[in-house]
């Protein structure tokens, strides 16, 4: 089988004096893995994400930023629980970021705070991102009433080109002053978005959002996967991490929905927000927003929530990176 072939090739390479292991200094995998350990793969992925993201839904309705922020309670909730069950603060911070539903952010933070847990954290983050359609709908239905699910939101206003260009510039400046530790991620996110929205660097934006992000994703998956060796991955801590990851997703989804319900108490009737977009604050783009749309259509086939849900969804991307910067600043 393939395993015996790989074992045979590995033995041949070692007999020839060639280094092949990811932890063997000088091997190809080890060189590629430095992009993970030194933390420059995730910022490059954020560059690509910024170049493919349209922030119009958020700019047209800025209060949706608060929904994205509320969903980050999952991160800090999981952090507190991880501390309570025996993880040290740095490990707990790395585990908590799973609740942000952002794989590159989870890898970036865990590579800084808990490199020994990075494989389990990365697998957990990406696994639960894929399980968003399974985890979120029951929570959304349980926490909302029929009348709340039928709320119709105002159509988003048209956003000018000037606003689209100014948003990443202002975002970059605010990030620099408020959360400097998150600058490697958010700085690249806003820079990538500026490439897209400026209109004069279309080729660079297309490269960042296409070939570059695809290449880095392949290298990231290859090296993180190669680092998850059985002796380090199949442990009791890994099981705890998977459990905490699931819990953080539940907390994040619930906190987003509950926040919208509370926020609606202070909004006039025509300005209310459909609580079904509260789940979209979990930054699994665009899966969380699609779930808002799918669940909403079950109760009203003419109520399209996707464009509204994209606001908290992209806000969640920013929020998870801000949370990572806060944890990094306090714990290192």
Regions found by a protein language model. Name each.
Residues 80-89, 121-149, 255-269, 315-332:
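Juxtamembrane and boundary regions of transmembrane helices in multi-pass small-molecule transporters
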Residues 30-45, 91-99, 126, 180-190, ...:
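Structural signature of hydrophobic alpha-helical transmembrane segments
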Residues 172-260:
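Transmembrane helical segments that form the transport core of multi-pass membrane transport proteins
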Residues 124-200:
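Membrane-embedded hairpin module used as a gating/binding unit in multi-pass transport
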Residues 1-25:
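Phosphate-binding loop of NTP-binding sites
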Residues 116-134, 242-252, 277-280:
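Alpha-helical transmembrane segments
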Residues 55-79, 231-257, 309-313:
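Entry/N-cap segments of selected transmembrane alpha helices
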Residues 38-39, 46-52, 67-77, 81, ...:
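Alpha-helical membrane segments and immediately flanking helix-loop junctions
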């Amino acid at each position: 089988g393939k395993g015996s072939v790989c074992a045979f090739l590995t033995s041949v390479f070692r007999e020839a004096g060639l280094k092949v292991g990811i932890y063997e200094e000088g091997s190809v995998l080890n060189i590629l893995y430095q992009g993970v350990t030194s933390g420059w793969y995730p910022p490059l992925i954020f560059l690509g994400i910024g170049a493919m993201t349209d922030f119009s839904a958020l700019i047209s309705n800025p209060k949706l930023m608060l929904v994205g922020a509320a969903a980050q309670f999952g991160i800090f909730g999981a952090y507190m629980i991880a501390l309570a069950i025996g993880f040290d603060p740095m490990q707990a911070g790395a585990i908590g970021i799973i609740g942000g539903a952002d794989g590159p952010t989870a890898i970036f933070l865990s590579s800084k705070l808990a490199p020994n847990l990075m494989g389990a954290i990365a697998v957990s983050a990406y696994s639960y991102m894929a399980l968003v359609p399974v985890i979120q709908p029951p929570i959304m239905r349980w926490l909302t009433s029929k009348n709340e699910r039928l709320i119709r939101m105002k159509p988003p206003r048209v956003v000018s080109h000037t606003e689209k260009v100014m948003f990443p510039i202002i975002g970059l400046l605010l990030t620099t002053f408020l959360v400097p530790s998150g600058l490697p991620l958010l700085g690249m996110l806003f820079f990538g978005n500026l490439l897209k929205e400026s209109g004069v660097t279309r080729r660079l934006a297309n490269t960042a959002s296409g070939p570059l992000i695809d290449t880095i994703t392949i290298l990231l998956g290859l090296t993180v996967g190669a680092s998850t060796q059985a002796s380090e991955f199949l442990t009791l801590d890994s099981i705890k991490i998977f459990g905490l990851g699931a819990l953080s997703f539940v907390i994040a989804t619930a906190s987003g929905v509950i926040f919208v319900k509370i926020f609606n108490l202070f909004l006039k009737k025509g300005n209310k927000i459909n609580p079904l977009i509260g789940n979209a604050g979990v930054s699994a783009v665009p899966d969380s927003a699609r779930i808002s749309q799918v669940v909403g259509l079950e109760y009203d086939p003419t109520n399209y929530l996707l464009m509204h849900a994209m606001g908290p969804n992209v806000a969640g991307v920013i929020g998870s990176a801000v949370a990572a910067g806060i944890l990094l600043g306090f714990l290192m």
